Structures are given as C-alpha cells and as structure tokens.
Amino acid sequence: MNFVIPSFIPAIPEIVLLTLTSLLLIADTIWSKRSEFATYYATQLILLVVGYLVLTSFSTSQVLTFDGSFVRDAFGDILKLVIVVVSMGIFLFSKEYLLQNKFYRGEYFTLGLFGVLGMFVMVSAYNLITMYLGLEIMSLALYAMVAMRKDNQHALEAAMKYFVLGALATGMLLYGFSMIYGATGSIQFDEMAQIIASGNVDNVVLSFGVVFIVIGLAFKLGAVPFHMWVPDVYHGAPTAVTLYIGTAPKIAAFAMLYRILVEGLPGLVEDWQSLIVMISVLSLIVGAVITLVQENLKRLLAYSGIGHIGFILLGIIAANPDGYSAAMFYTIVYSITALAGFGMIVALARTNNEFDLVADFKGMNKRNPWLALMMLFIMFSMAGIPPFVGFYAKVVVIEEVVQAGFTWLAVLAVVMAVISAFYYLRVVKVMYFDEPEDNTKIEPVSSQLNWAVSFVSIALLLLGLMPSSLITLCYNSL
C-alpha cells in the first residue's frame, strides 16, 4: 500500500486558522493580565489574514485534496469570505457589550474562531466524515459560548436545551449517514451520486437515510418543526452570543445542505424535495404567524429568522442551478441583515437595560434620529421592501420557485411575506409615532459602534441598488 502525501495548499486558510487560534488560546492567558483588548485585536487580525488567504487563492475550478474529502471551489470560497466578514462584524459589535456586562473574556473570541474553523470545514467538506467533523467543531464552540454566562440562569438553561437537542439532531444525522453509507458503500459525495445514479442500490434504505439527514439539517437551520431551540436559545443567551449564533452558522448550515443533498444525493431529489417542501411551508407559516405576538425583539428576530429559513429552502426546492444560486444569495443577504439587526440591539444595550424589547424603541426617532433611521433600513430590508436588498432576495427566490412549477408555494410565500411585514413595520411605527415611555435620551453609542451599525445598515440599501453583481457572483460559483 502506497502512502501519498496530500496537497495541503487548498486547505491553507483552515490550517493557518487552526494554528493561529491554538496559539491565541495559549497567549490569551498571558495577555489578559496586560491588555484586555489584545485578544480582540489578535482575533480580528487572524480573520483578516485568513480572509486574505482565501481571496488570494480564490479557486474558480474544483480542487480536491486529502483523498477527496476536502474540496476547494468558488462556491466554498465565496461563503468563506462572507463568514470572515460577518465574523469580524460580530466581534466588533460584541466587544463593548462584553465589557459593559462584565464578562469580557478571551474565551469568547477563541471559541468564536474555533466556530469559524468548523464553518470553514463544513463549507469545504466533500465526504460525510469531514462534514461531521466540521459540524462538531462548530457546535461544541457554540454550546460553550451560550453557557459562558455562568451567573445567568436563563443562559445556562438555554445552553442545556441547545446541547441536548443538538446531540439529538447529530444522532439523527449520523444515523442517516450510516444508512447512506450502507446502501452505497461510499462516504464521498461524488461517488455516492454516481452509485445512486447507477440504480444498483436499496432504495428503501436510501429513503430512510434521506429522512434522517433532512431532519438533522432542519434542526441545524432552525426550521419547523425542529425549531424548538431557536427562540429559547436566542432569548436566553447573552446578546453577543445570540448575534453570533443567528448569523454566520446559518451560512455553514446552508453549505452543508447544498453539499449533502445537491452534490451527494441528486439522484434522490424526489425524496428530499418533498420533505423540504413540507418543512419550508411550515417554517414560512410559523415564522410569520407566531412572530406577530412577540414583544421581545430577540425572540421576534428568532421567529422571523425561521421564516427566512423557509425562503432559503424554497430555492433548494427549485432543484436547479438558478434556484440554488437564489438560495445562496438569500443566505448571504439574511446573514448580513441579521448582523445589522442583532448588532443594533448589542450597540444599544446597557448594563441595566438589554434594549431587547419592542417597547424600548418607543420614540427612538426623538431620542436618537440617526440610529432610528438605521433601524428603519434594517426592518425594511427584513420585510422585503424595495429598494433594500431583502426585497430582491425574496424576488429571485420566488421567481425560481414559479419557474420550477411550484406556483402555489410562491403564492404562499408572498402571503407570508406580507404578514411578516406587519411586525417589522410595527417596530418602525413604535420608533416614529409612539411617545417614549420616558424623556431620557438613549445613552450615547460609541463612535466605533455607531460607524459599524451605519455601515452595515447602509450596505443593505447599496446592495439593493445594485443586486445583480452579487446574484451573478452566486450563480457563477455553482
């Protein structure tokens, strides 16, 4: 048996990220005594370096390494760059929140970097084992981050629920993986697709495997009926952690969905398509209806996020390259919009007020007109109101669903989008037309956070004015 040394070049960003994060974990014990910001700045520098490595080695063709278990392609590189940008925004927003709430720790940043590493591995995984490895790296980091606030009973409860349900979902995924492996005799996505296409497989075992895999994927995405953890974890976790969970991991979960179903199981499209139709419909309805009664903004964004996941799944249902690129575009747009939404809450939060209730935004236009305008941009984009980019994200997905012959599904999506616009516009109404409960001004937001919120919010408008470039980029990557 000949041992061939694999090419490490396609995985250089991941290797550098793992090495620097491990070194940072050790260095943090020294830095924490000298400079409380050293770990933060080192984290941002590491992300810049990794982003630069991805950008300079951008792959326009598919490159496999590590015996075909790791793939480097344009699809993966684009998602990795978005993960890097979103993660830098997360850490920028989180720094002051952690300081004000007296649990600024280097572990938040190192765990966050390990989470990014897991996302990178998931995005580039090309077999079932590598995908599981990336998923566990990301998940373990997230469990620990949710439980970081040891003195907060709600955070500990959220962490326990997240861990138990996460373990259950992982078990479902592994059971599905074992069935697919048992039926095909391979864990490589391309080989699985070829074997299934040949027809020499047990379709019953494959069908059961697909069911368990889709259930596991639905949990990771937070789709109905496997969404039980989403509102409680979003609400119970510290807002800085909610900001992390609600943004970048969604990109990795979408990549996981695409790699397994589209690249690994295209021959079973009729099986997984019908399941995803059901999950998407439930997510759209639950996400729109239950959000109507939410008064806590974090829970509101959690339930509305479930509705957005329903839209992402619509693109997958189309089962063609245009549909997949529309879903990819929606995922990127949603992650940026969620970053802006949760970032606004983090920026306004204070030690004695988390600023996470809709009522907290009453009369915000009188207390801080600029931030009220930025919040309006965020809410309009989430609602899908032109000319913001959220509108075009919904349009391209609905268009592809109609082209694929699911007109009834497109009509349902439009109706749910109209219903969901109500609770986003309610926040705008509260800011501009309700009187503040007290006449005190909102405590000044630091210039750094002010610029960050403004940049991300205005980006939602600018991307909406020229969406074709990002849509084309997504299409060409597949």
Swiss-Prot record:
Q: Per its UniProt record, what InterPro entries does this chain match? A: NADH-Q_OxRdtase_suN/2 (IPR010096), ND/Mrp_TM (IPR001750)
| Places the protein is found | Cell inner membrane
EC numbers listed for it are 7.1.1.-
Query: What residue stretch is flagged as signal peptide?
Result: none
Q: Keyword annotations for this protein?
A: Cell inner membrane, Cell membrane, Membrane, NAD, Quinone, Translocase, Transmembrane, Transmembrane helix, Transport, Ubiquinone
One GO cellular component term of this record is: plasma membrane
| Listed transmembrane segments | 7-27, 46-66, 74-94, 109-129, 163-183, 204-224, 237-257, 273-293, 300-320, 328-348, 371-391, 405-425, 451-471
A Pfam match is Proton_antipo_M
Q: Name one GO biological process term.
A: ATP synthesis coupled electron transport
Q: What class of enzyme is it?
A: translocase
- Catalysed reactions, as listed in the record: a quinone + NADH + 5 H(+)(in) = a quinol + NAD(+) + 4 H(+)(out)
Q: What main location does UniProt list? A: membrane
Q: Name one GO molecular function term.
A: NADH:ubiquinone reductase (non-electrogenic) activity
Q: How does it sit in the membrane?
A: Multi-pass membrane protein
NCBIfam families for the chain: NDH_I_N (TIGR01770), PRK05777.1-5 (NF004442)
Question: Into which family does the record put it?
Answer: Belongs to the complex I subunit 2 family.
Tell me, what does this protein do in biology? NDH-1 shuttles electrons from NADH, via FMN and iron-sulfur (Fe-S) centers, to quinones in the respiratory chain. The immediate electron acceptor for the enzyme in this species is believed to be ubiquinone. Couples the redox reaction to proton translocation (for every two electrons transferred, four hydrogen ions are translocated across the cytoplasmic membrane), and thus conserves the redox energy in a proton gradient.
Q: How would you summarize the oligomeric state and partners of this protein?
A: NDH-1 is composed of 14 different subunits. Subunits NuoA, H, J, K, L, M, N constitute the membrane sector of the complex.
The protein depicted here goes by the name: NADH-quinone oxidoreductase subunit N
* Upper taxonomic lineage: Bacteria, Pseudomonadati, Pseudomonadota, Gammaproteobacteria, Thiotrichales
